């Protein structure tokens, strides 16, 4: 939980936040909107990470090798430097839908946080090439569904229950 506002209000509600969050999974950020801002940037970072996963698995799928992508996700998630919840969910998606992600539309949608993050970055004069390009890739997949779009949409389904068919 990323909580903004007044410290006095946070302190009063901290027992509730502690009950809702995993151990050390909540933090206070001073100022109204600060918690939402931190969460927005979190989602922008997530866009870039998911796009990298999509690109990497698309490269492996198209290679001359007969690679089992689910097994790759599993080995990546056991001691690899890219071990993560996202890689774990990728393995789960391959287990459910196969390496071709059958039944997943290939149209990767977004809910706005990546766009808002790029808008803030631009207003601050900060380079955001990865986040910006990951947003553009999702927009392109709406017009031309792709395997990378399938990966993004499968991941979104795994962690947020997002629709696979859109």
Regions found by a protein language model. Name each.
Residues 15-31, 94-95:
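Acidic-glycine-rich active-site phosphate/pyrophosphate-binding loop
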Residues 3, 33-162:
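Helical "substrate-binding/catalytic lid" subdomain
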Residues 1, 6, 18-19:
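Glycine-rich phosphate-binding loops that contact phosphosugars or nucleotide phosphates
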Residues 7-12:
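Short helix-loop capping/hinge motifs at secondary-structure junctions, enriched
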């Amino acid at each position: 939980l990323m909580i903004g506002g007044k410290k006095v209000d946070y302190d009063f509600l901290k027992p509730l936040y502690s009950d809702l969050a995993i151990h050390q999974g909540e933090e206070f950020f001073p100022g109204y909107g600060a918690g939402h801002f931190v969460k927005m940037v979190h989602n922008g970072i997530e866009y870039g990470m998911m796009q990298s996963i999509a690109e990497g698995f698309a490269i492996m799928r198209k290679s001359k090798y007969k690679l089992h992508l689910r097994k790759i996700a599993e080995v990546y998630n056991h001691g690899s430097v890219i071990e993560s919840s996202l890689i774990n969910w990728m393995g789960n998606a391959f287990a459910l839908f196969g390496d071709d992600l059958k039944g997943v539309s290939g149209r990767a949608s977004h809910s706005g946080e990546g766009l808002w993050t790029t808008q803030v970055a631009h207003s601050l004069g900060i380079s955001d090439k990865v986040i910006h390009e990951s947003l553009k890739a999702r927009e392109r997949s709406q017009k031309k569904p792709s395997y990378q779009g399938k990966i993004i949409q499968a991941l979104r389904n795994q962690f947020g229950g997002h629709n696979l068919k859109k």
